[in-house]
């Protein structure tokens, strides 16, 4: 039986095993998929140990996407552009292929599942870590009017801007630099919701905007609750993105892209009723 895992710290909350079990059932594959907690200082060793036991591939989550980029011996074009990796495929040659499916997962969820075209929109992306890195190029490829990147440490946002210097419609700054500005879409790519915290968002930033949290929960995340209070026009968490990016990983491993709408509904039901 082929074995796969999601690796992170923390990772016990991950719904990736639930999702991939549904994909396997849907496509007639027999796999074992588990969640693997890696010590913060032993990511590489944990990955290599998993491969030695016969592991075929991995998904990578917080906080290891940059380390995964470094560990990969070969990269897809989208992982190379992002300089962050969220999927490994272990090749028979011994190589580790690194991919990044975050961006395509986000775009499919927002544009297809939620029917929100990004062309011509003003977008604010909060965060400059691995999650943000993976979605910048796919967002830019949708031709928004503006992509602003806000981060507590502006230098990190500037570094991302330089990665995509061929695009002139990127701006960066601290959160407070965007006070009083209007955005059509505000995306939380920080891990703050994992810790029941909030990025330092200016007052009234969300008014009439579409607020999207890349994390997911059975209830409104702190980010989405703030957006609701501030008058956001629409709220969405990252459950759909999680399923869509997982489908891309499944395609990389098995050569078939599973249907996602049913699994998104199943995930929503599971979040509300965890024993289902």
Curated annotation (Swiss-Prot):
Catalytic activity as recorded in UniProt: shikimate + NADP(+) = 3-dehydroshikimate + NADPH + H(+)
Keywords, sorted A to Z: Amino-acid biosynthesis, Aromatic amino acid biosynthesis, NADP, Oxidoreductase
Known pathway: Metabolic intermediate biosynthesis; chorismate biosynthesis; chorismate from D-erythrose 4-phosphate and phosphoenolpyruvate: step 4/7
Span of the signal peptide: none
One of the Pfam families matching this protein, by short name: SDH_C
A single GO BP: shikimate metabolic process
Functional summary from the UniProt entry: Involved in the biosynthesis of the chorismate, which leads to the biosynthesis of aromatic amino acids. Catalyzes the reversible NADPH linked reduction of 3-dehydroshikimate (DHSA) to yield shikimate (SA).
Complex and partners: Homodimer.
Family to which this protein belongs: Belongs to the shikimate dehydrogenase family.
Protein name: Shikimate dehydrogenase (NADP(+))
Organism of provenance: Nitrosomonas europaea (strain ATCC 19718 / CIP 103999 / KCTC 2705 / NBRC 14298)
């Amino acid at each position: 039986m082929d074995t796969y895992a999601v690796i992170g710290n923390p990772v016990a909350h991950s719904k990736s095993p639930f999702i991939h079990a549904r994909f396997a059932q849907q496509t007639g594959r027999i796999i074992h998929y588990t969640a693997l907690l890696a010590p913060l200082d032993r990511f590489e060793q944990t990955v290599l140990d998993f491969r030695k036991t016969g592991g075929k591939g991995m998904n990578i989550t917080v906080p290891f996407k940059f380390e995964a980029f470094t560990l990969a011996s070969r990269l897809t074009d989208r992982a190379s552009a992002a300089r962050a990796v969220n999927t490994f495929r272990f090749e028979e040659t011994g190589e580790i292929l690194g991919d990044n499916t975050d961006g395509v997962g986000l775009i499919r969820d927002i544009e297809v599942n939620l029917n929100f075209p990004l062309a011509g929109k003003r977008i604010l992306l909060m965060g400059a870590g691995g999650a943000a890195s993976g979605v910048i190029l796919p967002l830019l490829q949708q031709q928004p009017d503006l992509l602003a990147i806000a981060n507590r440490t502006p230098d990190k946002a500037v570094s991302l801007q330089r990665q995509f210097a061929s695009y002139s419609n990127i701006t960066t700054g601290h959160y407070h630099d965007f006070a009083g500005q209007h955005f059509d879409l505000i995306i939380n790519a920080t891990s703050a919701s994992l810790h029941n915290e909030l990025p330092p968002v200016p007052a009234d930033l969300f008014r009439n905007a579409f607020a999207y949290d890349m994390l997911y929960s059975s209830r409104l995340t702190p980010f989405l609750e703030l957006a609701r209070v501030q008058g956001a026009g629409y709220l969405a968490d990252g459950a759909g993105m999680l399923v869509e990016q997982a489908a891309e990983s499944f395609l990389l491993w098995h050569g078939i892209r599973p249907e996602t709408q049913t699994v998104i509904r199943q995930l929503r039901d599971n979040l509300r009723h965890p024993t289902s």
